[in-house]
Curated annotation (Swiss-Prot):
Lineage of source species: Bacteria, Pseudomonadati, Pseudomonadota, Gammaproteobacteria, Alteromonadales
Protein name as it appears in the record: Orotidine 5'-phosphate decarboxylase
Catalytic class of the enzyme: lyase
Keyword Transferase: no
Family to which this protein belongs: Belongs to the OMP decarboxylase family. Type 1 subfamily.
Species annotation: Colwellia psychrerythraea (strain 34H / ATCC BAA-681)
Record-annotated active site: K62
A single GO BP: 'de novo' UMP biosynthetic process
Any one Gene Ontology molecular-function term assigned to this protein's record: orotidine-5'-phosphate decarboxylase activity
Length: 231
């Protein structure tokens, strides 16, 4: 079974620009991530256009609400035919468990359900401001364990956390990582980066990469080069 490891983060202001980009790459080489901005602008029909072109879609909306509402939201995502959808682990075990149970009826067609632990923008002071007396690393570990206990498929994490999380949570628990930059590319707004090969080597399962691919003159060539380093 084809299992592309690269997930291209689509960040376009215009739908046509996004679709023009997508036409330059192959679904056998990458999956696509649709976040809050593009989903708010272009809606479910945009996701259907992408899946209609043969792409697996990671719907990155980070649901966080009461359990019934989140369960209905992930059901709607499953009905859209997405490959992966996420929630905030800080919504708690009941919310995550109910969301996972809502996907039971989809069997093998259910999307992967993953959780976000601590946002990469949050530091020690931010957590303390929320009454959380843990370091970011401790809170990531706590929420990742809660995610697994709740039956979810994996977490979004930093590549720097991946090796420890994979050791603690097992090979089957998926790790999805942003902040990946091919060797030689600009860092953009990501301060701590790893190359695709480095990330895979420490246990990351799926690599979220944006501008180094979306801004490339030949994105398919860049994808092939990245894939060549991790296969």
């Amino acid at each position: 079974m084809n299992d592309p490891k690269v997930v291209v983060a689509l960040d376009f202001d215009r739908k046509q620009d996004a679709l023009s980009f997508v036409d330059k790459i192959q679904p056998t080489d990458a999956r696509l991530k649709v976040g809050k901005e593009m989903f708010t602008y272009f809606g479910p029909e945009f996701v259907k256009q992408l899946t209609g072109k043969g792409f697996d879609v990671f719907l990155d909306l980070k649901f966080h609400d009461i359990p019934n509402t989140v369960a209905k939201a992930v059901t709607a995502a499953a009905d859209l035919g997405v490959w992966m959808v996420n929630v905030h682990a800080s919504g708690g075990s009941q919310m995550m468990t109910k969301a996972k149970q809502a996907l039971d009826n989809y069997g093998n067609d259910a999307p992967l359900l993953i959780a976000v632990t601590v946002l990469t923008s949050m530091g020690q002071e931010d957590l303390h401001g929320l009454g959380i007396n843990k370091t970011p690393a401790e809170q990531v570990n706590f929420l990742a364990n809660l995610t697994k206990q709740s039956g979810l498929d994996g977490v979004v994490c930093s590549a720097w956390e991946a090796e420890q999380l994979k050791a603690d949570l097992g090979k089957e628990f998926k790790l999805i990582t942003p902040g990946i930059r091919p060797a030689g590319s600009a860092q953009d707004d990501q301060q701590r980066i790893m190359t695709p090969k480095q990330a895979i080597d420490v246990g990351v399962d799926y690599l979220v990469i944006g501008r180094p691919i979306t801004k490339a003159v030949d994105p398919q060539l860049v994808l092939q080069q990245i894939n060549g380093t991790i296969r």
